[in-house]
């Protein structure tokens, strides 16, 4: 099984946030976020990430954090543009409830239960996890959420806070670029992965 546990530590998360901040600060900047190599298993109609798992998981944690901040802004102010952005972001993440189990990213067996708990949480947990990869997911969510929240907290009114969140949204969705490669044969996906990482 090539689905690995989540391994990004604080320094990788900080690098991600620094890259995001640099991209926000320079509107003409494009940030190359690495490569994603995928095996598209046509039999199971499932796509398996061979290379780029860590950045994909971190991206989903970022998107969920942003989604919650838009949602919180809407609930506290009834500012409708925030609600529209929250709905848009929920399309990226998917849904997970008793009625709807359609998350768009499923992690390794070891991490998926905690990831579901994280991606459906209303806020990051302060309770330390005993499993190392779960603790890394918890810390990533807490760090990213608190970073975005604190950077947009100073915004003096609703529209300024919305502008702040939108800056991060646009930097990530419009100017973070990945090289995406998909293969229908598993062997081909691994050859591509090995060639790119040689």
Enumerate the language-model features and the residues they cover:
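Glycine- and hydrophobic-rich flexible loops that cap the catalytic core of alpha/beta enzyme folds
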Residues: 1-198
């Amino acid at each position: 099984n090539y689905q690995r546990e989540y391994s990004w530590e604080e320094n990788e998360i900080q690098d991600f946030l620094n890259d995001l901040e640099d991209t926000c600060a320079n509107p003409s900047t494009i940030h190359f976020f690495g490569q994603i190599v995928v095996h598209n298993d046509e039999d199971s109609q499932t796509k398996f990430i061979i290379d780029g798992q860590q950045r994909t998981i971190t991206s989903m944690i970022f998107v969920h954090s942003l989604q919650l901040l838009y949602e919180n802004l809407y609930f506290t102010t009834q500012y409708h543009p925030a609600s529209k952005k929250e709905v848009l972001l929920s399309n990226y993440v998917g849904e997970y409830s008793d009625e709807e189990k359609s998350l768009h990213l499923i992690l390794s067996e070891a991490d998926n239960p905690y990831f579901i708990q994280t991606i459906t949480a209303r806020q990051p947990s302060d309770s330390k996890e005993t499993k190392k990869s779960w603790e890394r997911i918890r810390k990533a969510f807490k760090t990213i959420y608190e970073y975005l929240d604190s950077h947009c907290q100073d915004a003096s009114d609703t529209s300024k806070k919305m502008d702040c969140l939108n800056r991060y949204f646009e930097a990530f969705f419009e100017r973070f670029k990945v090289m995406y490669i998909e293969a229908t044969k598993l062997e081909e996906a691994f050859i591509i992965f090995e060639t790119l990482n040689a």
